[in-house]
Amino acid sequence: MGVRKDLKRAKRRTDLASRTRVEVVRDEDGVVREARTPALAPRPTTGSTADLPFTNAAEAPEAVVLRRRHDNGTWQPVTAAAFAREVTAVAKGLIAAGLEPGGRVAVMSRTRYEWTVLDFAIWAAGGQTVPIYATSSAEQVEWIVRDSDARFVVTETAENAATVTTGTARHERQPRIWQLDEAAMSDLTILGGHLPDEEVTKRRAALTPGTTATICYTSGTTGKPKGCVLTHANLHAEAANTVELLHPIFKEVTRQVASTLLFLPLAHILGRTLQIACLMARIEIGHCPSIKPDELRPALKEFRPTFLVGVPYLFEKIHDTGRATAEKIGRGASFDRADRIGVRFGEAYLNKFLETGKGPSPALYAAWALYDLLVYRRVRKELGGRMRYAISGGSPLDRNLNLFFYAAGIIVYEGYGLTETSAAATIVPPLRPRPGTVGVPVPGTAVRIAADGEVLIKGGVVFGAYWNNPAATDAVLQDEWFATGDLGALDEDGYLTITGRKKDILVTSGGKNVSPAVLEDRLRSRPPIGQCVVVGDNRPFVAALITLDPESVAHWLTVRKLPADTPLSEVVRDPRMRADVQKAVDYANEAVSRAESVRAFTLVEGEFTEDNGLLTPSLKVKRHAVTAAYAEEIEALYGG
């Protein structure tokens, strides 16, 4: 497989191994309490991320840095020179519209090419970008626009524009609104057509690394979103160090033109820093407006990326779809064997690569080769056929699922971070993968475990303040250490494992502390589970609310030759479905003690979605909203 050849070539390069040197600090008992990785990219003393398009245009004007999709499914290449010209034209339009240095422009759109142009144009004009999720309500928009004092808003659709208009109707000064679907980019280009390019050059020259680049509002599960202030230095620390660490694997060693399809919402900081890193490395970027697998899969087959950055949900759906397809053609048992073989093969090969054990036996190699023909190559085909690498973040990825993808020729590196850390604070180093962990500190970053188990982060990626909220800032920043609210542990080599959220820890009536995330992550990795919430605080045992994945339900009905329109109310009561869900529960319980295991569950009708207020835009469950919405079902679990 190409990916394993890549790793062998990379391993022979001694300069790459030195890039992942991790220093650890132990407490008096010998337990690792802190890990830090030296920076690979120097901190900038001048300039800003606004300079990137222009640096690329000067150094490699004909290099293809983006591809823009047309309605017929073709992808038009965009050169560095062309991208810089478009950024300049839109920046001049914003200046002509009245954007002052330090002024804020909100962008409310799904992920599309124009979003990237706007981000760099706002910076080039000396402004600050305020991203808004395209699914935000009028109330959320009202708060973000008012709190940030954004004078301009660029929306994608008429519906988005109407939401902004409604949300800001009572503002003393309504923002000026443009709409991408109604030629916003052309309008801005025409508006600034009379200005000389030098005006943009002058605005860019006034920016420094410490200038605010963006105010990102957290999609918190409770309370009003907080505006996280990130500077150009923050974004540079994240992108430049990540490129230095991963660039040799993603571009140089693979010996193929590197490209990625960006589908994460650009209102999320991970997507934003990804596009900066790609422009730094001149990796081709494409855009897809949806994270939904059914809409994403066709784009993957068209664009054929060499790597992706996604969330566990995507990898779970790809795996589950493969299994459902296999069952439809009578090869469900074969897929299950491929699953088991994949885990064993991935484990054995990694042991050999890391020199911690023997590699796959001849028999295991032969079994892998068979299932590569039957199963694994189909997985690669689903992802476009060229993909070798992926980065997963947002929540833990099931270890066995990670090993399955490894057997399929795709290495998934996990990372961990928050908006406040400019995206990734840790990542699994390419030459020292360790499935089941979220890696070591990103170069230039330190991770510390507090006495109560909370993960603390320090370094160039850490934000400086919440906008207009010094009390909230003081609550999480102490001596430049950011208190994440997550619980975790460092191993002997400085690899971090996240064990849950500090505020989500359940304490049963028997006094047992339970981290619901461990159970929930494993549950979600198994069909037919859609979403779930583990409960049990002040209760005699742990239980779970579980939704069914619609695709899994449709497949389940087909396999059992039941009517496709069978009501969900009947499906959730079917003993056969409950037996299948119990298998997923048993798998989740393998990771915990008996006292922490799920003893009972209820299958609820419907789904947890953004629309019903039970998911955030980044697909995280709003735990308190779910428990409130299903209070009766929870009481019934405990005999109430």
Task: Put a short name on every predicted segment.
Residues 2-19, 96-97, 124-191, 580:
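Structural core segment of the AMP-binding/adenylate-forming
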Residues 8, 70-72, 159-209, 322-376:
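ANL superfamily adenylate-forming
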Residues 62-120, 137-142, 233:
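Conserved AMP-binding/adenylate-forming core of the ANL superfamily
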Residues 62-64, 195-217, 224, 250-259:
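Conserved pre-ATP/AMP-binding loop-to-beta segment of ANL
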Residues 77-81, 213-240:
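Conserved AMP-binding A3 loop
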Residues 134-166, 238-261, 292-307, 382, ...:
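Conserved ATP-dependent adenylate/AMP-binding module captured primarily in the ANL superfamily
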Residues 236-259, 266-376, 386:
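Conserved AMP-binding/adenylation subdomain of ANL enzymes
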Residues 441-508, 525:
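Conserved ATP-binding/catalytic segment of the ANL
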